[in-house]
Structures are given as C-alpha cells and as structure tokens.
Amino acid sequence: MKEILDSRFLLTHYGAKDEEVLSRTRTRLAALRRERRGVLPSIVIAEVANAICQEAGRAEALAKLRALEHAGFEVVQLDPELARDAGLLKCMHRDLPMADCVIAATALRLGGRVVSDDPHFSKVKGLRTTWI
C-alpha cells in the first residue's frame, strides 16, 4: 500500500531530538524507499521548505529538500482533478487546512494511507492514516 508523507512526519524526522523517534522515522523512510511505496505530494515540499527555512534558514531548507528529492519517492503534482477533489474536501471539512485536503485527496486517489498524527485527517471518510 502506498504511504503518503505528510509534512508533520517529515518535520518530526528532521527536527527529532529523541533518538528513539529519529530511529523510527529513519526506519519508516528506509522501508518506504526500499519498497517503493513512499509518495510525496508537491504541497508537502512547499510546507517543509517553509517550516525548515523559518526555523533553520534557507541553506538548511535547501539541503534537506535536495536529500528529499533524491530519496526516490513518487512526487505527486497538483493537477486539475486533484485540485478539484481537494477543493470539494475543503468544502465538506471547512476546518481542514487546504494543504491537508490536497494530501488527503492524494491518498484517496491512490488508495493509500497518510503518514501523520494530525487529528484533522480522522474527519475524512475513508481516509486511512498511520504513524511511527
């Protein structure tokens, strides 16, 4: 099953101070690469770039993004159909951030699950999630 990476998972990985958390995120990322099940919505790249840039600066953000881009995950671009599906999810779930709607729509389209502990996702019918 495809696993759609949410920004919260990647930011947990990049910001992990706890060795156990870092070990678990590394293990998950390695398995997703090895099994070619990892999916990276393009909106997540934007969210991660912004968060790391604000926290650690532009150079650090670019370094992390280069590593992420070379990790071999399938990058899903926001196309018109996905945008429509995300917009309709937003209409039904007004408190769900638009980026999360795009991530949820990606998971629903691919029949995958979102790697996140974000409680927003539990509101979307038929959406599966997993965490470290």
Regions found by a protein language model. Name each.
Residues 1-40, 53-66:
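Short, well-structured N-terminal submotif of metal-dependent ribonuclease cores
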Residues 104, 108-132:
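Acidic, PIN/NYN-like endoribonuclease modules and their adjacent C-terminal/linker elements
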